[in-house]
Amino acid sequence: MASQLFRPLTPRLSSLTPVKPHFGHLQAGISVAIQRTDGRIHLAVVTEVRRDNAWVTVEWAEKGVKKGKKVALETIFLLNPALALAGPAAQGRASRSVSLAPPSVIGDQRTAARWAGKIPQRNETPSGDSLAVRVPSSPCLMTQRKSACLREIEKLQKQRERRRRLHREIRAQRARDADTGNAHYEIRRLIEECRRRLRGGRISGPEPRDGRRICVCVRKRPLNRQEATREDLDIVTIPSDNVVMVHESKQKVDLTRYLENQTFCFDHAFDDTASNELVYQFTDQPLVESIFRHGMATCFAYGQTGSGKTHTMGGGFSGRDQDCSKGIYAMVAQDVFLLLKTSAYEKLNLKVYGTFFEIYGGKVYDLLNWKKKLQVLEDGSQQIQVVGLQEQEVCCVEDMLNLVELGNSCRTSGQTSVNAHSSRSHAVFQIILKSRGKLHGKFSLVDLAGNERGADTAKANRKRQLEGAEINKSLLALKECIRALGQNKSHTPFRASKLTQVLRDSFIGQNSSTCMIATISPGMASCENTLNTLRYANRVKEITLNLRPRHRCLYPAEREMPRVLENHIRNSEMSLQGDEFIRIPCLQSEEEKETEGIKVLSSPLVDTTISWKEASQWPDNKIQDTSDEVNCNVDFCIAQLLSILEKKIDILTEIRRKLKLLQADIQKENRHGEVNGERSDLK
């Protein structure tokens, strides 16, 4: 029976004549193995070979239905590697390995089953009438040709894997170099890189201060024990003796952290290694001699609570005890008594008095008289007087220190979440010089209470919160006064609080000289408060003091200090290096010629020209050298140029005004001369 079934097959196979293959041995009419979409592999008959686009059309029967599909040439060669081999031997092997499906068996289920039985089967059996083909366990597959789209996808995948591998290496290197225990180790790394760049560039020193402007200095304290415990970062850098840079941490939309460096320029800047002696040398010591010449000097410390104001003014703490001999109070007293013994001031027969009072809750209390309540009033000459304030005469430095210790013991203080020894009041210590019972000079040392945020005192009791609100209210009033003075407004709200009333003469009083010490905290948690303090101090820097012309000799630029203070400065631990400036020759020669020509016509212009000569010393050599550096700090250069320009604009505006007045006077005199000449001609 089997011989009868396969009898027609032999002549049919023998009648096939070999045809010269195209695209290898692939041609129409042969059976090839194809793969279906569901993964099944079976035989199909090639009906058409498209040479133009390398496609092959195949057909097969399944459940009595003829089906067909188009298969790529690469796919045919992948499943039928023998078709691509060349040579007669390969052709013979191909004819043995590839079977042709007889057309007569298509449609007969039993014949198709027996035909399929002669062919080695694959694991998955095709359904219907389709024939299965065995794929060799280790076939000799051809390399499949890849399309351009597939090659581009593989290229992108390789690039993506290379980037990921590089990022993994970078993260591993950062983990090895950085302290992963700190949550802000990435910000620390950025700050260290910024500081390394700053060390490579040249930083210029402080510029000479104009005597009519408030001296503003900034002091940075070191990280305290509480900040070190929580591993807070130091975000404040002082690259030179008059520049402060704050590294503010920012975050992009993609959560990438970066630094925004904000630069401020002041008269002096002290880092966390500076001592109280160094701070005093460049802040209060130049003002001590002014009170011996009928001057009113003031120094006030401003800053966030816990930033070191009381430490600077009164001295350091050892537990709850304060060493008053290391503060600015004691240093001013020492220099006052030193100058009293000099020959220049000994003949004045001056007596020294001390007062100490505080402003707490909007009220004034005398710290040397059992905290007696005082009143701040204005007399007929519009001078602020503290009524009932007790003045105690002192004869030596030890007596002055006793007053300071007595006042500090009575001063209102408390403990907050930010500072264990927080001052809850504004303290004013005054050193008064009197000659024959009349006021000769006065030095006021003001230790302001620290401004507080509501978030810092949210867990405090009601008393502490009310104290913080009152402190912020008085400091806000002081800020509004400073803003009004900086904008030259007609009204300055000094009566808004007791603090501004007491400090009014320091800003607008005659013969006043003022110094501000802004203390800042270096911790990252205090970044917002630090920036507010620096902006506050930057606005104070623009205020011009009201000086009388007859007392201009009090603060000349080349004034020599007495030898006693000179030796004291020479013996200090360190000194700030001043800049060497150059003059502009063309401007100087022109101004000298103009001064000689108009000296008789306008005497006020001479003073303006002299001040312009002093101010025309531009530090262009320093700025040029800094800009020539490869790693120069652009923010620092811009801040320095803006600081220089702000100082020159006021002088140039005044010169222009005087020149216009002079021009009008000359034109007026010329018109009068012409009229007089015409009258003489008529006569």
Curated annotation (Swiss-Prot):
**GO cellular component term, pick one:** kinesin complex
Which UniProt keywords are listed? Answer: ATP-binding, Cell cycle, Cell division, Centromere, Chromosome, Coiled coil, Cytoplasm, Cytoskeleton, Kinetochore, Microtubule, Mitosis, Motor protein, Nucleotide-binding, Phosphoprotein
User: What's noted about post-translational modification?
Assistant: Phosphorylation at Thr-125 by PLK1 is required for activity in the correction of kinetochore-microtubules attachment errors, while phosphorylation at Ser-204 also by PLK1 is required for the kinetochore localization and activity in prometaphase.
Q: Which GO terms describe its biological process?
A: cell division; metaphase chromosome alignment; microtubule depolymerization; microtubule-based movement; regulation of chromosome segregation
- Coiled coil residues, start to end: 141-176, 640-672
Q: Which GO terms describe its molecular function?
A: ATP binding; ATP hydrolysis activity; microtubule binding; microtubule motor activity
The residues covered by the Kinesin motor domain are 213-543
Query: Coiled coil as a keyword?
Result: yes
Primary localization:
cytoplasm
Q: Which Pfam families match?
A: KIF2A-like_1st (PF22923), Kinesin (PF00225)
Q: Report the protein's function.
A: Plus end-directed microtubule-dependent motor required for spindle assembly and chromosome movement during mitosis. Has microtubule depolymerization activity. Plays a role in chromosome congression.
- Protein name, per record: Kinesin-like protein KIF2B
Originating species: Bos taurus
